[in-house]
């Protein structure tokens, strides 16, 4: 295996924060610190930082940038560095033991990142997700959808609780329907005790917010469908049980060529690969509770939908039930199959 010190001329470690980043440039061959500098996170600040690092590294194309928090604080810098033609990786985790007796500061952290990256094998480098084009657009829509769905649920729960405590003429013993919520949103103020007036006004406000979220979620779903239809993954929408949201999660989880090297690796990423837990004469496996839980949840939703509405899947479920398997075990098998199917 080739390590970074042999395959790259220089390594630049970056300790990232909201207002400023600290950059440390080291010689990959011997680990010598060539310079350490702080720059603001503005576009001009990042351009100056890249130019400064380029001068210290003689503009070598084989310079490797190791950036901390590459999906959050370091995202803009990672894009700028990639656009400048350099290779970018996620900074490795620095162990607490390695910091002992050294202390902690931004320059120390930046140098530690560069030094730790220098000793890694090339296949241990964590390359960032692709963050442009359709995949990044879907990632934004997925995050927005999850936030809106959560807020809609919170408002619905608040409205249900309000109607169960205050007699406003709506039967809230069961979950509220959109028809009932629409009716509430059209209520007018009326002559009644002050407590009921306030409760009714609050119910109207919550109902209107719920309907607004519903409309925005519908628009969000349409945007997802349009983007997925334009991507190479468009056939996903034709798969039984796969909707716009679950298809978007499958696409964004994949992120870039090379992240998943095999079908088994994709199953591990999705958290659907059984983990051996055997000892002596006992042979068994336990659930994989790691991996990308959002991707795992998407496969769960698809499996549940197929178990209810897909004829071939229902036939499979009946067969496995006659063999003595439980519904839970069958669902796990289905999720493992789906991981294999979508990888291929």
Question: Where in this protein do the model-derived segments appear?
Answer:
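Phosphate-backbone recognition surface of nucleic-acid-processing proteins
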Residues: 235-238, 244-327
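Nucleic-acid-processing active sites and adjacent nucleic-acid-binding tracks
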Residues: 29-60, 64
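Short alpha-helix plus adjacent loop in nuclease-associated cores
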Residues: 82, 89-128, 179-186, 282-290
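Short beta-strand-loop/turn "lid" adjacent to the catalytic site in phosphate-handling enzymes
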Residues: 62-79
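Short, charge-rich amphipathic alpha-helices with coiled-coil/heptad character
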Residues: 119-139, 189-194
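Glycine-rich, often acidic, oxyanion-interacting loops/wings at catalytic, nucleic-acid
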Residues: 141-234
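Gly/Thr-rich phosphate-binding beta-strand-loop-beta motif of the actin/hexokinase/Hsp70
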Residues: 2-28, 113, 148
């Amino acid at each position: 295996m080739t390590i970074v010190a042999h395959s790259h001329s220089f390594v630049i470690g970056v300790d990232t924060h909201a207002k400023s980043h600290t950059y440390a440039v080291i010689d990959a061959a011997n680990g010598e610190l060539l310079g350490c500098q702080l720059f603001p996170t503005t576009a001009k600040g990042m351009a100056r930082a890249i130019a400064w690092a380029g001068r210290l590294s003689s503009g070598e194309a084989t310079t490797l940038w190791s950036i901390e928090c590459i999906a959050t604080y370091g995202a803009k810098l990672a894009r700028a560095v990639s656009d400048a033609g350099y290779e970018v990786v996620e900074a490795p985790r620095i162990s607490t033991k390695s910091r002992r007796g050294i202390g902690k500061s931004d320059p120390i952290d930046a140098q530690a990142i560069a030094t730790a990256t220098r000793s890694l094998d090339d296949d241990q480098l964590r390359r960032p997700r692709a963050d442009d084009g359709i995949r990044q657009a879907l990632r934004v829509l997925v995050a927005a959808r999850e936030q809106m769905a959560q807020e809609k649920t919170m408002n619905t729960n608040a409205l249900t609780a309000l109607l169960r405590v205050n007699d406003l003429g709506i039967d809230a013993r069961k979950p509220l329907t959109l028809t009932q919520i629409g009716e509430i949103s059209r209520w007018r103020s009326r002559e009644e005790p002050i407590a009921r007036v306030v409760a009714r006004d609050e119910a109207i406000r919550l109902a209107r917010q719920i309907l607004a979220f519903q409309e925005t979620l519908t628009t969000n779903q349409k945007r997802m469908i349009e983007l997925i239809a334009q991507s190479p993954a468009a056939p996903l929408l034709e798969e039984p049980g796969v909707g716009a949201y679950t298809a978007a999660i499958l696409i964004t989880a994949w992120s870039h060529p090379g992240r998943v090297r095999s079908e088994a690796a994709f199953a591990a990423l999705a958290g659907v690969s059984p983990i051996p837990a055997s000892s002596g004469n006992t042979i068994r496996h336990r659930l994989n509770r790691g991996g990308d839980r959002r991707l795992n949840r998407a496969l769960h939703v698809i499996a549940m939908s197929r178990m209810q509405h897909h004829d071939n899947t229902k036939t499979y479920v009946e067969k496995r039930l006659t063999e003595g398997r439980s519904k839970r075990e069958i669902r796990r098998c289905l999720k493992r199959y789906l991981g294999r199917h979508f990888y291929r």
